[in-house]
From Swiss-Prot:
It comes from Salmonella newport (strain SL254). The lineage of its organism: Bacteria, Pseudomonadati, Pseudomonadota, Gammaproteobacteria, Enterobacterales. This is Cytidine deaminase. One of its GO terms (cellular component) is cytosol. GO terms for biological process: cytidine deamination. Its cofactor is Zn(2+). GO terms for molecular function: cytidine deaminase activity; identical protein binding; zinc ion binding.
Amino acid sequence: MHPRFQTAFAQLADNLQSALAPILANHHFPAMLTAEQVSTLKNTAGLDEDALAFALLPLAAACARTDLSHFNVGAIARGVSGNWYFGANMEFLGATMQQTVHAEQSAISHAWLRGEKGLAAVTVNYTPCGHCRQFMNELNSGLDLRIHLPGRAPHTLRDYLPDAFGPKDLEIKTLLMDEQDHGFTLTGDTLTQAAITAANKSHMPYSHSPSGVALECKDGRIFTGSYAENAAFNPTLPPLQGALNLLSLNGYDYADIQRAILAEKGDAALIQWDATAATLKALGCHNIDRVLLG
């Protein structure tokens, strides 16, 4: 078990500990539960879905990287597939505050990058900030997405974001988590192809500036992130943050990164290179390449 989970795990009910122990035994537990695992945990612990999600929130929050605020937020995105995806906030010392990943963004991008097609609910241990409410409004679940908070009745995103502005106001039909493939040809080595594949998945209906990042760890493991734009622009999630989020959720550290590649168009309206390189260098990675999409 990764050390970050030990304190939260010790506070769980005994029957839930017994069911979770083999799942968490892997140091690189992927911070997600399959629909089958969720069903097993519900039956073993005698909990319904909502109660189980609340019980697991401390494990999600344990994934937080909060060197600046020391305020850990955990979230669980519940996919329409039945799979559950952990998320937690991330802060990057030496970079800028704008590079921060919020817990809801973390869980949602985690689900998206693992191929989830839509979300039924998000469970989070603190009320979503305005930034996250706007980020969630880009999803194909729209304002019907259910939000679950401890000690409160569940509400929809519509309740938390009244008079919402979103992609429909800009006549955008393809939403975040809808399947997208921009068709860029895969070239180069495995890591380069992974970055291009991530760029092909980009949600960028406002700037038409696709981009993807691939990070290779010293053990050969590769994590990718795709660009996810938002109708309100500022809640947009850059591709590097998506990749770093997956890397961290899987129990890796920034020091494990040995190489990074950004794939983007050289003539795009928005360019990720400077911000991507600056953030990676702040985290200790200097082996950074860029491939131009054709």
